[in-house]
Amino acid sequence: MTEQRTAWGWGLASIDAAGNTLDVWYPELTLGEAPAETSRPNHNFGAIAHDEADARGVRRMPVFTVSKLDEPIEDAADAYLRLHLLSMRLAKPNTLNLDGIFAKLNNVVWTNYGPFAVDDFALRKLDVMAATRQSGAVLAPHVDVNVLSIDKFPRMVDYVVPTGVRIGDADRVRLGAHLSEGTTVMPVSYTHL
């Protein structure tokens, strides 16, 4: 019997009003057996984690994820953990079971204000613009929500910044890309899983 490969860590999940996971950011991951619940380290997300929906209709919730790397992906948090492992260089390409990844990830509107759900984007965009205006945080006469992409996979550098690489256009490198040290991604390149 072979030993099950696992990875684990605390992530900060963006959850929409319907309960869908839009994304999960893992600042640190560990390979190996996960600690017992009573021995888990603290997540240290503090005030950036909140159970109240923001103007985007998104709650930011801490999630503790344990991924069985040889088995199919269980949910969006597991999918994001595996994508982080690749981009953090904790796993090499073609060493993780990525079966079912597309079915587990939601299409997301990726913006300069973070992820939005697709179905109510127009209304939530108005809410964000109004909230930003009311907060007094806007110095310009007009605030806008800029859509960067609509996709299942976000830009890698919004989650992981690997050392020793050069990236000419961050929009062309998706989370899950494994960039070895010394890699240069030119503006006309594209890097994905």
For each of these PLM feature ranges, what is it?
Residues 4-8, 171, 183:
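Generic hydrophobic/packing signal
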